[in-house]
Design a protein with these regions (language model features):
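Polar, glycine-rich mid-to-C-terminal structural blocks
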Residues: 233, 237-240, 256, 260-366
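Amphipathic alpha-helical protein-interaction segments enriched in hydrophobic
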Residues: 219-230
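Membrane-proximal, proline-rich intrinsically disordered regions
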Residues: 19-67, 93-95, 348-371
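Flexible, polar/acidic helix-loop-strand segments at domain edges
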Residues: 353, 362-432
Length: 432
């Protein structure tokens, strides 16, 4: 944990020394334990900082490239970027790309500090405050939140690196970097054990706390459904061929049981599928119960500038709006970067039959290939002839994604697949 210290200039020290032979003062170290434990707010702020280490993938790590563009789901329209590392043979332990390793261990360290240094506090100075019991209720939950997050960080590590060192809160700093790697099975078991230890103790529903509720909303914090979801997802990875090359059926069985436990808990909580697919990424959907009804746990992402010269705060739209919709704008306006592949397009089944397009009796028509597909297709993929984005300034001409079209090759940076991304984007945003 970094310590921020007060620094005094040489001239200032000399001036103070000239006034007195002795000077009694105490420094306040911003993240010192004794400073943090003074109030509920400081401990809560330290705990909430852990949420900043949650990973997300909107192209922020790879020059605009989402991890889908490292797979056969998408093709990145610009060459020479770091996303290519994943498929050109240069990805390795010494060239891992991104900051997942360091960020996850920073998060783990912060969790361990909470669990070691910030337990069994009483906050006696605030016992007469009207909200003392509510604040203590929140504080007592922090240890369960921290343990969930620590398990989450280890899940992100094990799924990418396999076995990793597991760091105990009581380890001396000198010993931390000398820990051997646990096997992947040991790390997964650690995650399962932590989830089991936390699931019945962590707050179940922040919207139904009764007398323990605070005046401010607490949407977005980890609850018991979050813990069950982590356990179920980790079990699915543990049962996958990557970690289960022998095909151990008991792992499949456990993954199914853990998922059933999660689904039953979600049903009991009244969760359901959102009425509209696009509600899952709509503006301020976390404020609308009908739009967030199927989101177990999510990270809110606000617009971030791509560069100091880019006037837009709508980074996802800037990266992925179709190339060529506004050629007069700066290069970052509409970059058309993550382009859905034909493989992804072909994966969408037929709505009426539920069959894949290559299955007999599916109802697929080669002369009208996009008709009758799973409705999510139209909300995910922009194709030739679509009026996209929907902002008035862009709905002047249909997309031309055929070779030689205004949104297509051979223009450098245009889609190499004939498709552009819609999912996650707000089409009503005007970047001009």
């Amino acid at each position: 944990m970094k310590t921020n210290k007060l620094v005094y200039g040489l001239f200032g020290l000399m001036a103070l020394a000239s006034c007195s032979d002795k000077m009694d003062y105490s420094e306040t170290v911003v993240k010192d334990k004794d400073y943090v434990i003074q109030t509920f707010e400081k401990v809560g702020g330290f705990m909430t900082d852990i949420y900043n280490y949650a990973d997300y993938d909107y192209g922020q790590n790879f020059g605009g490239g989402m991890l889908a563009s490292a797979t056969d789901e998408s093709v990145y329209s610009v060459s020479g970027t770091s996303i290519e590392t994943f498929y050109n043979g240069s990805w390795s332990p010494s060239n891992a790309q991104g900051s997942l390793w360091s960020n996850m261990y920073k998060g783990i360290k912060t969790c361990n500090v909470v669990l070691k240094d910030f337990q069994d506090l009483k906050f006696e100075d605030f016992e007469l405050n009207a909200d003392y019991q509510q604040q203590m209720y929140r504080y007592e939950n922090y240890k369960w939140e921290a343990r969930f997050w620590r398990a989450y960080f280890y899940f992100n590590l094990v799924r990418q690196y396999g076995g990793v060192p597991v760091i105990d809160p009581e380890m001396a700093a000198a010993d931390v970097n000398n820990q051997p790697r646990k096997s992947s099975d040991e790390v997964f078991q650690y995650i399962f054990d932590e989830c089991d230890a936390v699931k019945d103790s962590i707050i179940k529903d922040y919207s139904d706390l009764g007398s323990m509720a605070l005046s401010t909303a607490e949407d977005g914090r980890a609850n018991n459904l979050t813990v069950l979801a982590l356990k179920a997802r980790a079990a699915l990875y543990w049962a996958s061929p990557l970690f289960n090359p022998s095909g151990d059926k008991e792992r499949y069985h456990k993954a199914a049981l853990y998922t059933k436990e999660l689904l039953d808990a979600c049903e009991a909580r009244g969760m359901k599928l959102a009425a509209k697919y696009a509600d899952l990424w709509s503006t301020n959907n976390y404020k609308d119960a009908d739009k967030k009804c199927e989101i177990i746990f999510g990270r809110r992402i606000y617009g971030t500038k791509i560069s100091s010269t880019d006037p837009s705060d709508n980074v996802v739209e800037s990266y992925n709006y179709p190339f060529g919709i506004d050629m007069a704008k700066a290069s970052y306006s509409a970059s058309g970067r993550n382009c859905p592949s034909q493989n992804l397009v072909d994966a969408y089944e037929m709505k009426d039959t539920g069959k894949g397009i290559n299955e007999a009796g599916s109802g697929y028509d080669e002369q009208n290939p996009y008709a009758g597909r799973d409705p999510r297709f139209e909300l995910t993929i922009a194709k030739n002839g679509d009026l996209w984005p929907t902002a008035a300034n862009y709905k002047k001409a249909a997309l031309q994604t055929y070779y030689g079209g205004v949104n297509a090759e051979p223009l450098v940076g245009a889609t190499p697949t004939g498709y552009y991304l819609k999912k996650l984007l707000h089409g009503d945003i005007d970047l001009t």
